[in-house]
Design a protein with these regions (language model features):
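Intrinsically disordered, low-complexity transcriptional effector regions
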Residues: 1-79, 130-142
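Short beta-strand elements
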Residues: 169-177, 182-186, 299-321, 378-380, ...
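Short, Gly/Pro- and small/polar-rich lid/capping loops
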Residues: 146-168
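Basic DNA-binding helix
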Residues: 60-132
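Catalytic core of soluble alpha/beta enzymes
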Residues: 353, 363, 370-592
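Mobile "lid/hinge" segments at catalytic clefts and subdomain interfaces of large enzymes
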Residues: 191, 288, 292-360
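Metal- or metallocofactor-binding catalytic centers and their adjacent structured scaffolds
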Residues: 185-277, 286, 331, 361
Length: 613
């Protein structure tokens, strides 16, 4: 952990049990030798044995001090105690190093050392610089800047369960400020462009969905190698760059995006504590956001598609309280509409019909897409929120796409291919819904590779066309969506990008090109609240955490309300302007338009040079 020069006069080794004579020469008052003893034979303050009595109560201690005046220590005694304390600290740190030797022994030497050699860290590493420094040499100003106490002491990962019962990764990080913990969301749905979540693929354990390999990669590779670099936890970009280079693959398939992202997020938490500020403020600094905007929530009320066995083709029907006065009021509007729908359905179909899905929405036995829209529209009216609440639809059209068409009866194994819809016909359904009902946003309107349909629908409406599966938080696909004007807003998910830095770069790219941003949850979420601070820190304008039920969903909404309370008069709710860029600061982002994403380097990381300073 420390590179301590044993030749330094302030770090004199005291490894023997015999007394060691030290001549302090010009010590005031005496030139006699003094003797230092190994601390194994004494405890703190053992020079004064009478001070070590068991004074268990304040009264006893007070009486003792009154009758036993403490003797003043001479300079030699002060030096002696400092030397003993220094020895104890060195031994304590050595014991921690020894504890990690077992983990370091399992690091694959050949592939990872080769990969690390490509990352230019050796010339700035404190160990390298200090190894050649003697007592007579002085460190340069740049070298002094990076010599600091090791910020990361312990990095420990474990396998936990997400809210669907599927294993995911959790990481503990210990610094001088304490313990920080993050659990990343997971999913068993494989997308072609998102970073790879590493699974064990052992049928005998969790049906092959265990994450012990990802946990092992953190405990034996990422953790020890990251600790060696002696990087401050506030150096988010440098740490993320290091882990990307350590993995060495484009989609993070070697170490696992679930492993890398978990470490990236826990570093952000520790970095916020190091800077003495809330997590959302730290994220604002990382993203260059000057003013804080609280998001409009997409509150899931009804589910269909693959989330339900009902007849609804689209996956989610949500409420957006765009006319609310603040975020707390928005949650009140969403919750009241949710429970009105629940009570209405229970009265009509029975209480068992309001089954709650993984996302917190209700699986209501409706057979028509229009039935769901009519039910929500009536709920908005009956609750008195006309003009204050609008409807958002997550079509998840990739699930409907078959043989070049869209099958709205895809749940029926005997559906007729002649009834498959073209992109144009499906677009007409969306446009009609926007005219007849208060629908303001369509998410994943088409298949993620149906670029022409995305661009056409975006040009035909001013309402929000939100891409989620379209880009999968992949920087290349985000750039392609910007170039083709496919949609006017993009969803960002934590575990799809791989690192917090990559997610922030995607956000900057979208904002600089006038796209809206929605920070989204996943089915297999955890009780971690990071997403709440993320959406506030980015001033994204929109957040999607599911329904106003289930602990992992409500916890995130509650955290945003706490942040709003903390901000007080400075809190600004996005409202109708949920797609607009936050005012008050520049979004320093490159406008990147790829010619052919298959043959381009991984922007913006192709020319990264790792620098500790």
């Amino acid at each position: 952990f420390f590179n301590m020069d044993t030749n330094d006069s302030h770090c004199t080794s005291l490894e023997t049990n015999s007394s060691v004579a030290l001549n302090f020469g010009g010590s005031p008052g005496s030139s006699d030798n003094m003797f230092l003893y190994d601390d194994s034979s004494m405890s703190d303050g053992s020079l004064y044995a009478s001070d070590q009595e068991n004074l268990s109560t304040p009264r006893k201690r007070s009486e003792y001090r009154r009758h036993h005046k403490r003797r003043l220590r001479c300079p030699q005694q002060q030096i002696q105690q400092r030397q003993a304390a220094n020895l104890r600290e060195r031994r304590r740190m050595q014991s921690i190093n020894d504890a990690f030797e077992g983990l370091r022994a399992h690091i694959p030497t050949l592939p990872y050392e080769k990969r690390l050699s490509k990352v230019r860290v050796d010339r700035n590493a404190p160990d390298t610089m200090l190894s050649g420094v003697t007592n007579s040499q002085k460190l340069s100003h740049e070298q002094k800047k990076i010599i600091h106490k090791m910020p990361i002491k312990i990095l420990l990962a474990r396998q936990i369960l997400d809210t669907t019962g599927i294993p995911t990764v959790e990481v503990d990080m210990v610094t001088e400020l304490g313990l920080f913990r993050v659990g990343v969301p997971s999913t068993d749905v494989k997308k072609i462009a998102e970073a790879v979540q590493l699974r064990d693929n052992k049928p005998s354990e969790f049906a092959g969905k265990g994450v012990n390999n990802a946990v092992k990669n953190i405990n034996t590779i990422i953790g020890p190698e990251l600790i060696k670099q002696n990087l401050e936890v506030t150096m988010q970009k440098e740490i993320d760059q290091f882990m990307i280079a350590l993995d060495g693959t484009e989609n993070k398939s070697r170490l696992g995006a679930n492993a890398i992202m978990c470490v990236s997020l826990v570093v952000a938490k520790a970095g916020a504590a190091k800077k003495g500020m809330p997590l959302y403020r730290h994220i604002s600094d990382l993203a260059g956001v000057a003013s804080i905007i609280l998001p409009v929530p997409h509150i899931t009320v009804i589910v269909g598609g693959v989330l339900s066995s009902n007849g609804l083709p689209f996956q989610e029907y949500m409420i957006m309280p765009t006319g609310a006065s603040n975020f707390a009021n928005a949650m009140r509007i969403g919750s009241e509409i949710y429970h009105y729908v629940k009570n209405s359905v229970s009265a009509k179909y029975g209480a068992q019909t309001s089954f709650v899905s993984h996302t917190g929405g209700m699986s209501i036995p409706l057979e028509s897409h229009r039935d769901a829209l009519m039910l929500l529209t009536d709920a908005i009216k009956q609750c008195g929120y006309i003009g204050k609440a609008e409807i958002s639809i997550n079509a998840s059209a990739t699930d409907l796409f078959k043989d070049g068409g869209y099958d709205l009866e895809f749940k029926n194994p005997n559906s007729n291919p002649q009834n498959y819809m073209s992109s144009d016909k499906l677009a007409e359904i969306y446009l009609d819904n926007m005219k007849e009902y208060p629908v303001c946003s369509i998410e994943d309107a088409f298949d993620f590779d149906d670029w022409a349909a995305w661009s056409t629908l975006t040009a035909r409406t001013t309402n929000q066309i939100l891409g989620n599966d379209l880009t999968q938080t992949n920087v290349r696909r985000v750039g392609l969506a910007v170039e083709k004007k496919a949609g006017n807003a993009i969803a960002l998910r934590l575990n799809q990008s791989g690192t917090l830095t990559e997610l922030i770069e995607s956000y900057k790219l979208l904002q600089s090109n006038g796209f809206g941003v929605c920070v989204c949850d996943r089915w297999g979420d955890t009780d971690d609240l990071f997403i709440a601070d993320l959406v506030v820190g980015l001033s994204a304008g929109q957040v999607k955490c599911g329904g106003p039920v289930r602990g992992e969903r409500v916890g995130k909404y509650n955290q945003i309300m706490r942040i709003e309370e903390e901000l007080g008069a400075l809190a600004k709710y996005a409202g109708k302007n949920y797609r607009e860029r936050p005012a008050g600061g520049k979004m320093h982002a490159k406008i990147w338009v790829p010619e052919d994403p298959r043959f381009l380097p991984r922007w913006p990381y192709a020319d990264w040079s790792f620098n500790c300073i």
